[in-house]
Every structure is written in structure tokens, then in C-alpha cells.
Amino acid sequence: CAEWTADEMRRIGIPEVELIETPGHPIVYGQWLGAEGAPTVLFYGHYDVQPVDPLDLWESPPFEATIRNGEIYARGAADDKGQVFMHLKAMEACLSRGERLPVNIKVVLEGEEEIGSVHLDSFIREQKERLAADVLVISDSPMFDRGVPSICYALRGLTYYQIDLQGTTQDLHSGSFGGAVANPAFVLAQVLAQMKDRSGRVKVPGFYDDVRVLSDDERVEFKKLPFSFP
């Protein structure tokens, strides 16, 4: 997949393309720097995909793109091969007519996003100067709705917590101890139930300390979208 993507980038007219080896899957890098004095846009995407299981639920082979009712069905059509291909086709539309792109373009496509981008950080550190750009476009987010152009400028983050519960160290007869001795499974359920209030707000102390509050302008713009937002 990495080799195919690199070949496709060369085919559409990107002059500098290479596969950069990592301890895992290679990173595809390409650049077109023919717009002297113009800003540089760095595109990021990934060519790896989620597993296809369960196969029996697929109506068509997952790695053979199929069009049904005007929709493309294939593994990666929405995450992230479809978005990557869209940007490449936009570049091709200009370059194939002999036109210059209005901005300089750099493209980074990795093959390990679905497993945590384990080698991307080291690649970025090693290639910091090479990756210098005026703006970064992450080609890995969904459309909001049909006919609604979207610029996704943030995603939800995540955090990890470990909860350790210690119960009895030996088996206890349920007829003698059931209900009298705390069951760690039920205690854990109670703990989890208390982590959020009825409105969904997290009750863990300090959870929101570094979370930026939505601005009034953002709320105004969100309310224009065709969905409800509290």
C-alpha cells in the first residue's frame, strides 16, 4: 500500500517522493515546492486501516472498492484512504493541466495510525526542518453532512485511569458470605457509575482543569449546524 501510494504521487506529478523506512511500516513522503514565495501546506494522513473482521458482514470484498447507490464501499473509504485520495486527486486536477499549485505542498502518510502512530514522533523529530510549513492539514476527519463543507479544528482527547480494587484473597461460599462480603465487581460498577453525573459531566477531581471552555463565537457557529448542541 505504501509503494502504491508513492507511485501514485509520482504519477500525478509530485516530483520528490520517497519511502522512509521506520522500525515498523514505512512513511510515504512527497513534496512539490514550485510556488516560490507562497505558503507551504503540510498534509498528514495514513494508509493503514482498521481490521476487516467480521468478514461475513461485508456485502462486497473489503479491499475491492465497490460503488453501490453512488457510495464507495471498501475498507478505508472513510478512514483514511478516501480523504488522502481526495487531496491527491485535487493536486492531480491542477498538475495534469500544466498548472502550478497555488501553494507549496508537503505530504506525510504513515502506516501505523491505527496502532498509535508508534514511530511518527521520532520521524517528526528527525525530519523537523524538512517538515517546516505554514499550516498543517490533517486529512483524517469526517464530513459533517452532505453538502456541508467542514473544517475540523479539534477532536476529543482521551485520558487513562487505573482503578485497583482488592477483595478477598480466597473463594467464599455464596450461601454463607453472599451479600455480607463486598463483591469487587459490584464495587467497581458503583465507582464507574459515580464518575459522571446525570448530564454526562465527569466528576473526577481536576478533570476539567486544563480544558478550554468553548467561546461565545464557537457556540454561535455550532448552533448554525443542523444538529442540537447544548
Q: What are these model-derived regions, one by one?
A:
Residues 99-183:
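Histidine/acidic-residue-rich, glycine-tolerant segments that coordinate divalent metal ions
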Residues 10-11, 96-99, 128-129, 168-170, ...:
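Generic secondary-structure signature for well-ordered alpha-helical cores
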Residues 38-109:
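Active-site metal-coordination/substrate-binding segment of hydrolases
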Residues 81-99, 117-125, 182-194:
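Active-site-proximal alpha-helical scaffold in enzymes
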Residues 144, 153, 174-230:
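Acidic-enriched catalytic cores of C-N bond-cleaving enzymes acting on peptides and small amides
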Residues 1-55:
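N-terminal helical capping/dimerization or prosegment-like subdomains
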Residues 34, 45-47, 67, 159, ...:
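Short, small-residue-rich loop/turn micro-motifs
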